Amino acid sequence: MKPVFKEQELVDVMEVIETTDLMDLVVFNDDVNTFDHVIQTLIRVCKHTNEQAEQCTLIIHYKGKCTVKNGTFDFLRPFRDAICEVGIDAKIV
């Protein structure tokens, strides 16, 4: 016997599952860390390309913050911890 589901119900359930698990790793601007330090940290920790790291760093500088990675909390925690260990302010939101 086949379960009876409407296609829209399945899509709605899948959207809820996908959106509730995803979180953002956000890096915040400060007056202490240099551009080079933030860029090198994003390359080393988040595996960004040089261009990605530079763009994120400029956004952090001009906008005050930038999302540098997405994923579940458990996935993002080691990235956040490594970024914070080198003195850069990062939070999972």
Model-derived segments and spans:
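Terminal domain-initiation and capping elements
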Residues: 1-93
